[in-house]
């Protein structure tokens, strides 16, 4: 209607006052409306601006009545819709703020049960790390970071994407925490304290057994030591039985000789057995030689015995110095020396003969080895010569095969081929007979054909 009629329309003062009055909003919106006054809707402003202020006439009032009714209806509808929309918008905004505050409050302050579970996890992780460090195993930090990253991932995704879950979903998300049994299974099936103690006990036992084996490997067993001492004491007892008593000076020299090889063996960290020591010295003395030479026999037999052997020797010498045994020894010395003199000469001869035999055997072996090496060298030289000759023959054959086609090509190149020019006449030469034949004239050659 307003578009069809171009006549000026004026509103009465009562209607203009009602339009200018502010609609009373709720208490929450009043503060915002005080700061920002609510403007009138756009169609109402346009109508007011377009309407001129003039004194209406009777004819104009008749035509303006339908237009006034339409404008009043439109402005009333707009004014009713605006506060409703504002209220709905504010209610939604308040709900969103409340949800955000609840989420932040729940995210910052977990319940006491959740805190206790979180502390329990940390304590278990610390205990497991300490146990692994004690056992020589260090957990990788990447696994821990991944485990923590998996827990933080959903919360960070929700905050980053702006997704705000409802309070019920948050409570369910926070309330879902694994029980201690599930935690133990997730952390790699941690051993119970009893099993851990057993595992540590086994490791300690293994270490102790290894240390004992090392100690035993360096030091001979007590049984071996006793046998070794028994072997050393036997010649001394034989000497006492024969009545020979070494002088104190010889004993001191004997002890000095014993201590020197012991120091050397300790410095090297290896103790040779009595047989190895005898081989190292290059002398193997029989028990009869030990009877005749008590000082040398004791030095050769007791080199690896240590302080225990020296103590036994001292005891034996102390026992031999008793007054009752001294007389018996003095009486038996004459008979013993006379009987052992020929035995020593025979033994020396045997030892010398053995040494000579060993030297001869060594020389024979060396000669045999030299002969074998020379024969092998000869055989290898012959084989090399044969191979070289074969290769030379093969090369000669190949050269001949290659040179034959080259000779044929050279012969063909030596015979020139003359091509006559277009203005020249080629001289036809008769064929020359081979050596020893004479050519007849052409007439005589044609006669036999006729």
From Swiss-Prot:
Listed GO CC annotations: cornified envelope; cytoplasm
Post-translational modification: Substrate of transglutaminase. Specific glutamines or lysines are cross-linked to keratins, desmoplakin and to inter involucrin molecules.
Biased composition (Low complexity): 120-135, 295-344
Similarity-based family: Belongs to the involucrin family.
Chief location of this protein within or outside the cell: cytoplasm
Biased composition (Basic and acidic residues): 86-108, 187-200, 264-281, 345-370
Biased composition (Polar residues): 1-19
Any one of the GO BP annotations: keratinization
Organism of origin: Lemur catta
Span of the signal peptide: none
UniProt entry keywords in alphabetical sequence: Cytoplasm, Keratinization, Repeat
Protein role: Part of the insoluble cornified cell envelope (CE) of stratified squamous epithelia.
Quaternary structure note: Directly or indirectly cross-linked to cornifelin (CNFN).
Subcellular location: Cytoplasm
Tissue and organ expression note: Keratinocytes of epidermis and other stratified squamous epithelia.
Disordered, as annotated region: 1-43, 77-370, 422-450
Entry protein name: Involucrin
